[in-house]
Amino acid sequence: MAFPRTLAILAAAAALVVACSHGGTPTGSSTTSGASPATPVAVPVPRSCAEPAGIPALLSPRDKLAQLLVVGVRDAADAQAVVTNYHVGGILIGSDTDLTIFDGALAEIVAGGGPLPLAVSVDEEGGRVSRLRSLIGGTGPSARELAQTRTVQQVRDLARDRGRQMRKLGITIDFAPVVDVTDAPDDTVIGDRSFGSDPATVTAYAGAYAQGLRDAGVLPVLKHFPGHGRGSGDSHNGGVTTPPLDDLVGDDLVPYRTLVTQAPVGVMVGHLQVPGLTGSEPASLSKAAVNLLRTGTGYGAPPFDGPVFSDDLSGMAAISDRFGVSEAVLRTLQAGADIALWVTTKEVPAVLDRLEQALRAGELPMSAVDRSVVRVATMKGPNPGCGR
Protein backbone atom coordinates (compact mmCIF):
# COMPACT_ATOMS: atom_id res chain seq x y z
CA MET A 1 0.00 0.00 0.00
CA ALA A 2 1.45 3.35 -1.02
CA PHE A 3 0.06 5.37 1.88
CA PRO A 4 2.15 3.91 4.75
CA ARG A 5 5.30 4.31 2.65
CA THR A 6 4.47 7.99 2.05
CA LEU A 7 3.72 8.45 5.73
CA ALA A 8 7.01 6.91 6.76
CA ILE A 9 9.02 9.03 4.33
CA LEU A 10 7.36 12.18 5.61
CA ALA A 11 7.95 11.12 9.20
CA ALA A 12 11.60 10.61 8.48
CA ALA A 13 11.88 14.12 7.14
CA ALA A 14 10.12 15.57 10.15
CA ALA A 15 12.04 13.68 12.84
CA LEU A 16 15.52 12.39 13.58
CA VAL A 17 16.03 9.16 11.70
CA VAL A 18 16.57 6.27 14.09
CA ALA A 19 18.03 3.02 12.79
CA CYS A 20 15.91 -0.05 13.26
CA SER A 21 18.39 -1.60 15.68
CA HIS A 22 18.42 1.43 17.96
CA GLY A 23 16.93 0.90 21.39
CA GLY A 24 18.09 3.98 23.29
CA THR A 25 15.99 5.60 25.97
CA PRO A 26 14.38 8.90 24.91
CA THR A 27 15.54 11.86 26.92
CA GLY A 28 13.50 14.11 29.12
CA SER A 29 11.11 12.06 31.20
CA SER A 30 10.04 14.95 33.40
CA THR A 31 6.35 15.72 33.47
CA THR A 32 4.07 18.54 34.39
CA SER A 33 1.57 18.25 37.22
CA GLY A 34 -0.94 15.46 36.68
CA ALA A 35 0.98 13.72 33.92
CA SER A 36 2.37 10.20 33.93
CA PRO A 37 4.87 9.38 36.68
CA ALA A 38 8.42 10.52 35.93
CA THR A 39 10.01 7.14 36.72
CA PRO A 40 10.00 5.01 33.55
CA VAL A 41 7.98 1.82 33.91
CA ALA A 42 8.51 0.43 30.41
CA VAL A 43 11.73 -1.19 29.24
CA PRO A 44 13.09 0.55 26.12
CA VAL A 45 12.54 -1.63 23.07
CA PRO A 46 14.16 -1.52 19.63
CA ARG A 47 12.24 -0.05 16.76
CA SER A 48 10.80 -2.85 14.71
CA CYS A 49 11.28 -3.37 10.99
CA ALA A 50 9.03 -6.42 10.82
CA GLU A 51 6.04 -6.65 8.52
CA PRO A 52 2.74 -5.85 10.32
CA ALA A 53 1.79 -9.53 10.66
CA GLY A 54 5.02 -10.19 12.56
CA ILE A 55 4.74 -7.32 15.03
CA PRO A 56 2.66 -9.06 17.75
CA ALA A 57 5.33 -11.73 18.23
CA LEU A 58 7.92 -9.05 18.98
CA LEU A 59 6.02 -7.15 21.67
CA SER A 60 5.28 -7.88 25.31
CA PRO A 61 1.59 -8.08 26.23
CA ARG A 62 1.76 -4.63 27.87
CA ASP A 63 3.41 -3.07 24.82
CA LYS A 64 0.77 -4.64 22.57
CA LEU A 65 -1.95 -3.07 24.70
CA ALA A 66 -0.15 0.28 24.76
CA GLN A 67 -0.21 0.37 20.96
CA LEU A 68 -4.01 0.39 21.14
CA LEU A 69 -4.12 3.64 23.14
CA VAL A 70 -4.22 7.22 21.83
CA VAL A 71 -4.22 9.85 24.57
CA GLY A 72 -4.49 13.62 24.67
CA VAL A 73 -1.44 15.53 25.87
CA ARG A 74 -1.12 18.96 27.45
CA ASP A 75 2.37 19.82 26.30
CA ALA A 76 5.71 18.42 25.20
CA ALA A 77 6.67 17.18 28.67
CA ASP A 78 3.38 15.33 29.04
CA ALA A 79 3.82 13.74 25.62
CA GLN A 80 7.44 12.82 26.28
CA ALA A 81 6.56 11.14 29.57
CA VAL A 82 3.68 9.02 28.30
CA VAL A 83 5.58 7.90 25.19
CA THR A 84 8.80 7.16 27.08
CA ASN A 85 7.23 5.53 30.12
CA TYR A 86 4.37 3.59 28.54
CA HIS A 87 5.03 3.28 24.78
CA VAL A 88 1.50 4.43 23.90
CA GLY A 89 0.57 4.04 20.28
CA GLY A 90 -0.39 7.65 19.75
CA ILE A 91 -1.05 11.09 21.13
CA LEU A 92 -3.88 13.53 20.50
CA ILE A 93 -3.36 17.24 19.97
CA GLY A 94 -6.47 18.66 21.61
CA SER A 95 -8.02 22.00 22.46
CA ASP A 96 -5.92 22.22 25.65
CA THR A 97 -2.59 21.23 24.11
CA ASP A 98 0.21 23.81 24.23
CA LEU A 99 1.00 24.20 20.53
CA THR A 100 4.63 25.05 21.22
CA ILE A 101 5.02 21.27 21.09
CA PHE A 102 5.41 21.83 17.34
CA ASP A 103 8.49 24.02 17.84
CA GLY A 104 10.81 21.00 17.70
CA ALA A 105 9.88 18.89 20.70
CA LEU A 106 7.39 16.73 18.79
CA ALA A 107 10.01 15.68 16.24
CA GLU A 108 12.31 14.59 19.07
CA ILE A 109 9.51 12.64 20.76
CA VAL A 110 8.61 10.91 17.48
CA ALA A 111 12.26 10.05 16.83
CA GLY A 112 12.66 8.54 20.29
CA GLY A 113 9.36 6.68 20.39
CA GLY A 114 8.48 3.04 20.92
CA PRO A 115 8.60 -0.08 18.75
CA LEU A 116 6.26 1.36 16.08
CA PRO A 117 6.01 4.90 14.72
CA LEU A 118 4.09 7.24 17.01
CA ALA A 119 0.64 8.25 15.72
CA VAL A 120 0.03 11.99 16.12
CA SER A 121 -3.66 12.80 15.81
CA VAL A 122 -5.87 15.87 15.88
CA ASP A 123 -9.49 16.99 15.52
CA GLU A 124 -9.10 19.37 12.58
CA GLU A 125 -12.41 19.53 10.72
CA GLY A 126 -12.31 23.20 9.77
CA GLY A 127 -15.06 25.55 10.87
CA ARG A 128 -15.69 25.56 14.62
CA VAL A 129 -13.64 22.40 15.29
CA SER A 130 -10.14 23.57 14.42
CA ARG A 131 -7.35 22.76 16.89
CA LEU A 132 -4.57 24.06 14.64
CA ARG A 133 -6.17 27.26 13.39
CA SER A 134 -3.26 29.43 14.49
CA LEU A 135 -0.77 27.24 12.63
CA ILE A 136 -2.50 26.39 9.35
CA GLY A 137 -4.09 29.66 8.28
CA GLY A 138 -7.29 29.97 10.29
CA THR A 139 -10.31 27.75 10.72
CA GLY A 140 -11.43 27.54 7.12
CA PRO A 141 -15.10 27.13 6.15
CA SER A 142 -17.39 24.67 7.91
CA ALA A 143 -18.35 21.46 6.13
CA ARG A 144 -21.84 22.78 5.48
CA GLU A 145 -20.47 25.96 3.94
CA LEU A 146 -18.09 23.97 1.77
CA ALA A 147 -20.91 21.85 0.37
CA GLN A 148 -22.96 24.96 -0.35
CA THR A 149 -20.24 27.08 -1.94
CA ARG A 150 -17.50 24.83 -3.38
CA THR A 151 -17.22 22.04 -5.91
CA VAL A 152 -16.16 18.55 -4.90
CA GLN A 153 -12.76 19.09 -6.53
CA GLN A 154 -12.29 22.38 -4.67
CA VAL A 155 -12.97 20.62 -1.38
CA ARG A 156 -10.41 17.95 -2.19
CA ASP A 157 -7.87 20.64 -3.02
CA LEU A 158 -8.60 22.53 0.21
CA ALA A 159 -8.26 19.38 2.32
CA ARG A 160 -5.03 18.48 0.56
CA ASP A 161 -3.56 21.94 1.21
CA ARG A 162 -4.58 21.92 4.88
CA GLY A 163 -3.41 18.33 5.18
CA ARG A 164 0.02 19.23 3.84
CA GLN A 165 0.34 21.94 6.47
CA MET A 166 -0.68 19.46 9.15
CA ARG A 167 1.77 16.87 7.87
CA LYS A 168 4.62 19.38 8.01
CA LEU A 169 3.80 19.84 11.69
CA GLY A 170 4.01 16.08 12.25
CA ILE A 171 0.30 15.16 12.23
CA THR A 172 -0.40 11.67 10.88
CA ILE A 173 -4.14 11.24 11.65
CA ASP A 174 -7.03 13.69 11.34
CA PHE A 175 -10.35 12.83 12.97
CA ALA A 176 -12.22 14.18 9.97
CA PRO A 177 -14.35 14.36 7.93
CA VAL A 178 -17.68 14.29 9.73
CA VAL A 179 -19.92 11.89 7.79
CA ASP A 180 -23.08 12.54 9.80
CA VAL A 181 -26.18 13.38 7.77
CA THR A 182 -28.28 16.22 9.18
CA ASP A 183 -30.19 19.42 8.54
CA ALA A 184 -29.99 20.49 12.19
CA PRO A 185 -29.21 24.17 12.91
CA ASP A 186 -25.61 25.25 12.49
CA ASP A 187 -24.90 25.64 16.21
CA THR A 188 -26.14 22.20 17.33
CA VAL A 189 -23.70 19.43 18.23
CA ILE A 190 -23.27 18.32 14.60
CA GLY A 191 -25.01 21.13 12.74
CA ASP A 192 -22.65 22.87 10.33
CA ARG A 193 -20.00 20.22 10.92
CA SER A 194 -22.06 18.07 8.51
CA PHE A 195 -21.88 18.42 4.75
CA GLY A 196 -25.68 18.33 4.62
CA SER A 197 -28.93 16.41 4.88
CA ASP A 198 -28.64 14.50 1.60
CA PRO A 199 -26.65 11.25 1.92
CA ALA A 200 -25.36 11.52 -1.65
CA THR A 201 -24.03 15.03 -1.02
CA VAL A 202 -22.37 13.94 2.20
CA THR A 203 -20.80 10.97 0.43
CA ALA A 204 -19.38 13.12 -2.36
CA TYR A 205 -18.04 15.95 -0.21
CA ALA A 206 -16.81 13.86 2.71
CA GLY A 207 -15.16 11.54 0.21
CA ALA A 208 -13.41 14.48 -1.43
CA TYR A 209 -12.22 15.80 1.94
CA ALA A 210 -10.91 12.38 2.93
CA GLN A 211 -9.10 12.00 -0.38
CA GLY A 212 -7.47 15.40 0.03
CA LEU A 213 -6.09 14.32 3.40
CA ARG A 214 -4.82 11.07 1.87
CA ASP A 215 -3.16 13.06 -0.90
CA ALA A 216 -1.25 14.91 1.83
CA GLY A 217 -0.18 11.75 3.67
CA VAL A 218 -2.65 12.16 6.55
CA LEU A 219 -5.04 9.35 7.50
CA PRO A 220 -8.70 10.49 7.43
CA VAL A 221 -11.06 9.08 10.05
CA LEU A 222 -14.78 9.05 9.23
CA LYS A 223 -17.09 9.90 12.13
CA HIS A 224 -19.40 9.26 14.00
CA PHE A 225 -20.49 5.72 13.04
CA PRO A 226 -23.30 4.71 12.73
CA GLY A 227 -24.61 8.30 12.56
CA HIS A 228 -24.93 11.18 15.02
CA GLY A 229 -26.86 13.48 12.69
CA ARG A 230 -30.34 12.64 13.97
CA GLY A 231 -29.32 11.77 17.52
CA SER A 232 -31.43 12.93 20.45
CA GLY A 233 -28.79 15.22 21.92
CA ASP A 234 -25.09 15.84 22.51
CA SER A 235 -23.01 12.88 23.71
CA HIS A 236 -20.66 15.36 25.40
CA ASN A 237 -23.51 16.08 27.81
CA GLY A 238 -25.20 12.70 28.23
CA GLY A 239 -26.64 9.66 26.53
CA VAL A 240 -27.81 10.00 22.93
CA THR A 241 -30.32 7.80 21.13
CA THR A 242 -30.55 7.64 17.34
CA PRO A 243 -33.46 6.51 15.18
CA PRO A 244 -33.76 2.70 14.90
CA LEU A 245 -31.20 0.84 12.81
CA ASP A 246 -33.69 0.26 10.00
CA ASP A 247 -34.04 4.04 9.64
CA LEU A 248 -30.27 4.62 9.70
CA VAL A 249 -29.71 2.13 6.88
CA GLY A 250 -31.48 4.31 4.32
CA ASP A 251 -29.97 7.61 5.44
CA ASP A 252 -27.19 7.97 8.03
CA LEU A 253 -25.31 4.83 7.02
CA VAL A 254 -25.42 5.47 3.27
CA PRO A 255 -22.10 7.38 3.07
CA TYR A 256 -20.21 4.60 4.82
CA ARG A 257 -21.13 2.08 2.12
CA THR A 258 -18.89 3.96 -0.29
CA LEU A 259 -16.36 5.68 1.95
CA VAL A 260 -15.13 2.60 3.85
CA THR A 261 -13.92 1.21 0.50
CA GLN A 262 -11.65 4.20 -0.16
CA ALA A 263 -8.59 3.06 1.75
CA PRO A 264 -6.60 3.90 3.69
CA VAL A 265 -9.24 5.23 6.04
CA GLY A 266 -10.27 4.86 9.66
CA VAL A 267 -13.69 5.00 11.29
CA MET A 268 -14.61 6.49 14.66
CA VAL A 269 -17.54 4.88 16.46
CA GLY A 270 -19.75 7.30 18.38
CA HIS A 271 -21.34 7.08 21.82
CA LEU A 272 -24.78 6.45 20.34
CA GLN A 273 -27.51 4.09 21.50
CA VAL A 274 -29.18 2.59 18.43
CA PRO A 275 -32.53 0.83 18.87
CA GLY A 276 -32.43 -2.52 17.13
CA LEU A 277 -28.63 -2.69 17.33
CA THR A 278 -26.94 -1.73 20.61
CA GLY A 279 -29.64 -1.99 23.26
CA SER A 280 -28.73 0.22 26.21
CA GLU A 281 -25.02 0.29 25.33
CA PRO A 282 -23.45 3.08 23.28
CA ALA A 283 -22.17 1.96 19.88
CA SER A 284 -18.58 2.63 20.93
CA LEU A 285 -18.87 -0.16 23.53
CA SER A 286 -21.13 -2.45 21.49
CA LYS A 287 -19.96 -5.64 19.78
CA ALA A 288 -23.03 -5.50 17.56
CA ALA A 289 -22.17 -2.00 16.33
CA VAL A 290 -18.53 -2.81 15.59
CA ASN A 291 -19.59 -6.06 13.92
CA LEU A 292 -21.99 -4.09 11.72
CA LEU A 293 -19.06 -1.96 10.60
CA ARG A 294 -16.64 -4.85 10.20
CA THR A 295 -18.92 -7.13 8.20
CA GLY A 296 -21.11 -4.58 6.40
CA THR A 297 -23.90 -7.12 6.78
CA GLY A 298 -27.08 -5.32 7.70
CA TYR A 299 -26.50 -2.07 5.84
CA GLY A 300 -25.28 -3.16 2.42
CA ALA A 301 -21.59 -2.34 2.77
CA PRO A 302 -18.51 -4.44 2.06
CA PRO A 303 -16.41 -5.71 4.97
CA PHE A 304 -14.12 -3.15 6.61
CA ASP A 305 -10.73 -4.18 7.96
CA GLY A 306 -9.26 -0.74 8.59
CA PRO A 307 -8.60 0.81 11.99
CA VAL A 308 -11.61 1.42 14.22
CA PHE A 309 -11.33 4.18 16.84
CA SER A 310 -13.54 4.93 19.81
CA ASP A 311 -14.72 8.46 20.39
CA ASP A 312 -13.30 10.17 23.51
CA LEU A 313 -13.79 7.87 26.50
CA SER A 314 -12.98 10.33 29.30
CA GLY A 315 -14.50 13.72 28.50
CA MET A 316 -17.96 12.84 27.19
CA ALA A 317 -20.79 12.29 29.65
CA ALA A 318 -22.40 9.56 27.53
CA ILE A 319 -19.49 7.41 28.76
CA SER A 320 -18.07 9.12 31.85
CA ASP A 321 -21.44 9.18 33.63
CA ARG A 322 -21.45 5.36 33.49
CA PHE A 323 -17.85 4.16 33.45
CA GLY A 324 -14.39 5.10 34.59
CA VAL A 325 -11.72 5.37 31.92
CA SER A 326 -10.17 1.94 32.57
CA GLU A 327 -13.51 0.17 32.29
CA ALA A 328 -14.53 2.16 29.22
CA VAL A 329 -11.25 1.35 27.46
CA LEU A 330 -11.65 -2.34 28.24
CA ARG A 331 -15.22 -2.36 26.99
CA THR A 332 -14.41 -0.62 23.70
CA LEU A 333 -11.62 -3.12 23.00
CA GLN A 334 -13.90 -6.00 23.97
CA ALA A 335 -16.43 -4.63 21.49
CA GLY A 336 -13.85 -4.88 18.72
CA ALA A 337 -12.43 -1.38 18.41
CA ASP A 338 -8.71 -1.26 17.62
CA ILE A 339 -7.85 2.03 19.29
CA ALA A 340 -9.20 3.53 22.50
CA LEU A 341 -9.06 7.33 22.56
CA TRP A 342 -9.25 9.72 25.48
CA VAL A 343 -7.97 13.17 26.34
CA THR A 344 -5.61 12.92 29.35
CA THR A 345 -2.53 10.89 30.20
CA LYS A 346 -2.90 10.37 33.94
CA GLU A 347 -5.06 7.25 33.54
CA VAL A 348 -2.61 5.37 31.29
CA PRO A 349 -0.87 3.22 33.95
CA ALA A 350 -4.17 2.17 35.53
CA VAL A 351 -5.64 1.44 32.09
CA LEU A 352 -2.70 -0.78 31.15
CA ASP A 353 -2.91 -2.57 34.51
CA ARG A 354 -6.63 -3.24 33.96
CA LEU A 355 -6.09 -4.45 30.41
CA GLU A 356 -3.30 -6.80 31.46
CA GLN A 357 -5.58 -8.16 34.17
CA ALA A 358 -8.29 -8.70 31.55
CA LEU A 359 -5.85 -10.60 29.34
CA ARG A 360 -4.86 -12.91 32.18
CA ALA A 361 -8.50 -13.49 33.15
CA GLY A 362 -9.62 -14.21 29.60
CA GLU A 363 -11.88 -11.15 29.51
CA LEU A 364 -9.91 -9.81 26.53
CA PRO A 365 -8.64 -12.46 24.09
CA MET A 366 -5.00 -12.15 23.07
CA SER A 367 -6.03 -13.12 19.53
CA ALA A 368 -8.21 -9.99 19.32
CA VAL A 369 -5.40 -7.81 20.68
CA ASP A 370 -3.00 -9.26 18.11
CA ARG A 371 -5.43 -8.52 15.27
CA SER A 372 -5.72 -4.93 16.43
CA VAL A 373 -1.94 -4.59 16.74
CA VAL A 374 -1.59 -5.77 13.14
CA ARG A 375 -4.15 -3.19 12.00
CA VAL A 376 -2.36 -0.46 13.93
CA ALA A 377 1.01 -1.48 12.47
CA THR A 378 -0.48 -1.51 8.97
CA MET A 379 -1.97 1.95 9.56
CA LYS A 380 1.36 3.36 10.73
CA GLY A 381 3.60 1.82 8.09
CA PRO A 382 7.29 1.00 8.57
CA ASN A 383 9.59 2.85 10.93
CA PRO A 384 11.80 5.48 9.30
CA GLY A 385 15.05 3.85 8.29
CA CYS A 386 13.60 0.41 7.68
CA GLY A 387 14.06 0.58 3.94
CA ARG A 388 10.55 -0.56 2.99
From Swiss-Prot:
Q: Which GO terms describe its molecular function?
A: beta-N-acetylglucosaminidase activity
**EC number, UniProt record:** 3.2.1.52
**Places the protein is found:** Cell inner membrane
Q: In which pathway does it act?
A: Cell wall biogenesis; peptidoglycan recycling
Q: Which GO terms describe its cellular component?
A: cytosol; plasma membrane
The record gives the membrane topology as: Lipid-anchor
Q: Where is this site: Important for catalytic activity?
A: 234
Q: List the catalytic residues.
A: 236 (proton donor/acceptor), 311 (nucleophile)
According to the record, the signal peptide region is 1-19
Q: Which UniProt keywords apply?
A: Cell inner membrane, Cell membrane, Cell wall biogenesis/degradation, Glycosidase, Hydrolase, Lipoprotein, Membrane, Palmitate, Signal
Annotated positions binding substrate: 123, 131, 193, 223-224
Q: Which GO terms describe its biological process?
A: carbohydrate metabolic process; cell wall organization; peptidoglycan turnover
What the entry lists under InterPro entries is as follows: Glyco_hydro_3_N (IPR001764), Glyco_hydro_3_N_sf (IPR036962), Glycoside_hydrolase_SF (IPR017853), NagZ_Beta-hexosaminidase (IPR050226)
The reaction(s) annotated as catalysed by this protein in its Swiss-Prot or TrEMBL entry are: Hydrolysis of terminal non-reducing N-acetyl-D-hexosamine residues in N-acetyl-beta-D-hexosaminides
| Superkingdom of this protein's organism | Bacteria
Q: Where is the lipid attached (S-diacylglycerol cysteine)?
A: 20
| Residue numbers with lipid attached (N-palmitoyl cysteine) | 20
A Pfam family assignment = Glyco_hydro_3
Q: What does this protein do?
A: Plays a role in peptidoglycan recycling by cleaving the terminal beta-1,4-linked N-acetylglucosamine (GlcNAc) from peptidoglycan fragments. Acts as a regulator for GlcNAc-MurNAc levels by cleaving disaccharides and allowing the breakdown of MurNAc.
Q: Which family does the record claim for this protein?
A: Belongs to the glycosyl hydrolase 3 family.
Query: What name does this protein carry?
Result: Beta-hexosaminidase LpqI
Q: Which organism does this record belong to?
A: Mycobacterium tuberculosis (strain ATCC 25618 / H37Rv)
The upper taxonomy is: Bacteria, Bacillati, Actinomycetota, Actinomycetes, Mycobacteriales
Q: Which gene encodes it?
A: lpqI
